[in-house]
A protein has these predicted regions:
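Bacterial carbohydrate/catabolite-sensing allosteric modules
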Residues: 42, 83-88, 106, 136-140, ...
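Short beta-strand and adjacent tight-turn residues that come in two discontinuous sequence segments
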Residues: 116, 121, 177-178
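N-terminal helix-turn-helix DNA-binding module of bacterial transcription factors
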Residues: 1-59, 73, 245, 325
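Acidic (Asp/Glu)-rich catalytic clusters
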Residues: 129-135
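Amphipathic helical "hinge" segments at domain boundaries
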Residues: 45-110, 114-117, 192-195
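ATP/adenylate-binding site constellation spanning eukaryotic-like Ser/Thr protein kinases
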Residues: 15, 33, 59, 78, ...
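Short beta-strand segments enriched in small/hydrophobic residues
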Residues: 15-20, 54-70, 166, 174-181
Length: 327
């Protein structure tokens, strides 16, 4: 494997001159630059990325910290981030935090030590104080952290209200909500939207709200109990599509037909929701665009460009599948 010294010898220049050509820093005459570039090509020399990052204190690498890579929403987000980064010759470093604050803090410290250029994070545990004095720029994705941390998210509150209204229009009279974890901002906003639409209904009871933790298995378990104890429920708003799948599994096990006896609507618009039978009705986020927008925003900050807008809030769209149709 060719080294920088081999290139210097072939081009009959110093190692320092080769370094200036590689890093495009300092003065090098045009003739010398061509000699060095020719030597690099003929020797098939690949600059050491670690050494360059130490020299330049940057690595052309972005870290994406996600809470649960098993949730199909997050790989779709990651694809949007990565595709944008690839157009700018940045590399993506993927980190899975499991909603663990210690892991998130450790990742934040790691990216500073490794000269990672910036971080896109989906977190419900870190606060502005955890971000404030970091040496790398941070963009919050899906779950805003605070006014001073740039963010990309959707209108969860309004989207959940639309979801419940759709269930009402499908003829549902008793609508339950399988919510996500407590103290997770998007989960809380979707819960508030549901409550706004049904809280004053004469039939409403808080027993119609259970927590599925954004987990398909947990959701199937709590939905089994919910429907067994409250057979009058004829509509369920699941806090995300992943949980909507758990709802449908529970309905199958109980012999409840979807949508003839139970209407189900999710939130997110993940591709997997289109592969279920019946196909899930959902409030679709522009998932891919969320990832691309977060990456574009972060790169503008890293490159010192003018940032006219620090917080992006996208609207969601009703995608009528087959889980809310009534004969």
């Amino acid at each position: 494997v060719a080294t920088i010294r081999d290139v210097a010898m072939a081009a009959e220049v110093s190692v320092a001159t080769v370094s200036r050509v590689i890093n495009n820093s300092g003065y090098v005459s045009e003739d010398t630059r061509k000699k060095v570039e020719s030597a690099i090509e003929s020797l098939n020399y690949k600059p050491n990325a670690v050494a360059r990052s130490l020299f330049k204190k940057q690595s052309k690498t972005i870290a994406l910290i996600l809470p649960d890579i098993k949730n199909p929403f997050f790989p779709e987000v990651a694809r949007g981030v990565e595709d944008l980064l690839n157009t700018r010759e940045y590399t993506l470093l993927l980190c899975n935090s499991d909603e663990d604050i210690e892991k998130e803090i450790n990742y934040m410290e790691m990216v500073e030590q490794k000269y990672v250029d910036g971080v896109i994070i989906v977190t419900s545990t870190l606060t502005p104080k955890h971000i404030k004095n970091r040496a790398v720029p941070v963009v919050a994705l899906d779950r805003p952290i605070g006014e001073n941390v740039p963010s990309v998210s959707v209108n969860n509150y309004d989207g959940s209200r639309q979801a419940v209204r759709h269930l009402k229009s499908a003829g549902c009279k008793r609508i339950a909500h399988i919510r996500g974890p407590m103290n997770v901002i998007n989960s809380d906003e979707r819960y508030k939207g549901y409550l706004k639409e049904v809280g004053n209904e004469p039939w409403f009871d808080h027993k119609y709200i259970v927590t599925g933790e954004f987990d398909v298995r947990k959701t199937a378990e709590v939905t089994m109990r919910l429907l067994a104890e409250n057979p009058e429920i004829d509509g369920i708003f699941a806090g995300n599509d992943y949980m909507a799948m758990g709802v449908m599994k529970a309905a199958r096990q109980l012999g409840i037909r979807v949508p003839e006896e139970l209407s189900v609507i999710g939130f997110d618009g993940i591709e997997m929701g289109q592969l279920t039978s019946p196909e899930i009705t959902t409030m679709a986020q522009p998932i891919y665009d969320l990832g691309r927008t977060a990456a574009e925003l972060l790169l503008r900050i890293i490159e010192g460009k003018y940032v006219a807008k620090k917080h992006y809030v996208f609207e969601v769209e009703l995608i009528a599948g087959q889980t809310t149709l009534r004969n």
